[in-house]
C-alpha cells in the first residue's frame, strides 16, 4: 500500500515561489497499476519523483509499505530505493556498457556476487524479450529495445514498486503498446505495484486500474479508469477522454445546416454490456423514429468497454423525445443533447 497524505512541494526562486504539488492525497493498492495524467506543468513528474525521494516534499507524508520515505536515513533510503525502482522517458542507460552490463549495474552496486548478478541479468533480459542482444550497446538498439533494457535494469533488485516517468512518451504507437503489454506481464510475474505518469489517455485506458488527473499541482479527479471514462467530471478530464475517443464532432456543429424545429443531434454514451446492445434497432422499432449515424466509437479498458454514438433525429416531438431519453436512461445509456432545432 502506498499512501500520500497532504503532499506539498514548493520551489523557491529569486522572483517568486512556485507551488508544484498542492496538497495531494492518494491511496494506491498493492499490486495495482495506478496512473497519473496531466498536461505539461501539471506537477505529475514532480509528484512521482517524491515517491523515492529524488525530490523531497515540502510537507506531507509518503508512506510505502509502512515506511515514511522522508524520515528514512540515507542508508535506509538507499535500501528502500532497491524496492521502489524507476524507468524514465529517455531510458537513462549507460552508453558505454552493453545490455548485459546495464542490467547487472544495480546488482553490482548492491554487492551481489558477479556470477549471481550475471545469471539474474540474463533471466531478466529474456523476460523483457531481448535474449540474443546481451552484447549489444544502447546505440545499436531501437527506442523500444532501450526501454526494455530500462525495465530489466529496474527489476534487478526485485522491487515491490515500479515508477514509470513518461516511459512511453518517446515511442511510436506500436512500440508503446508493446511496452505496455510488457509492463502488464512483469506486473503479473513479479507481483509489482506500478505507478505511471503520462499525458496519453490511451496509456491510462490500456493498462491502469485507477487514475488521478492533475492540473496546476492538484488532483482534480480520481477513480477507477472505467468510471472516469464513463462519466468524466472536470473539463480537463473531459478533454483527455474526448481526445482518446477521437470525438471532435462538437467542433464541427457550428458548420452544420440549421436543423428543423423538431430535430435533434444527440450523443449517446454507454458502457459495459451496453456497448454490444442493438441501440439503433431499439430506437427504430420501439420508438418508431428515424436516425442518422453521424459518428461512433468504442474503446476498451481493463475493466470493460465504453463508447459513444452521435445521431441525428430528423423529426421527433418534444414529448416523444423526453420519453425516448427516459427509456434509454433506464437502460443505463446517457443521452446528451448537442443541438436542437
Swiss-Prot record:
It catalyses: L-methionine(out) + ATP + H2O = L-methionine(in) + ADP + phosphate + H(+); D-methionine(out) + ATP + H2O = D-methionine(in) + ADP + phosphate + H(+). It holds the Pfam family ABC_tran. ATP binds at residues 38-45. This is Methionine import ATP-binding protein MetN 2. Belongs to the ABC transporter superfamily. Methionine importer (TC 3.A.1.24) family. InterPro entries: AAA+_ATPase, ABC_transporter-like_ATP-bd, ABC_transporter-like_CS, ACT-like_dom_sf, MetN_ABC, MetN_ABC_transporter-like, NIL_domain, P-loop_NTPase. GO terms for molecular function: ABC-type D-methionine transporter activity; ATP binding; ATP hydrolysis activity. The keyword Nucleotide-binding applies. Its main location: membrane. Residues 2-241 form the ABC transporter domain. It comes from Staphylococcus epidermidis (strain ATCC 35984 / DSM 28319 / BCRC 17069 / CCUG 31568 / BM 3577 / RP62A). Disulfide bonds: none annotated. Keywords: Amino-acid transport, ATP-binding, Cell membrane, Membrane, Nucleotide-binding, Translocase, Transport. It is an enzyme of class 7 (translocase). Part of the ABC transporter complex MetNIQ involved in methionine import. Responsible for energy coupling to the transport system. The complex is composed of two ATP-binding proteins (MetN), two transmembrane proteins (MetI) and a solute-binding protein (MetQ). SUPFAM superfamilies: ACT-like, P-loop containing nucleoside triphosphate hydrolases. GO terms for cellular component: plasma membrane. Its EC number is 7.4.2.11. It is a peripheral membrane protein. It is found in: Cell membrane.
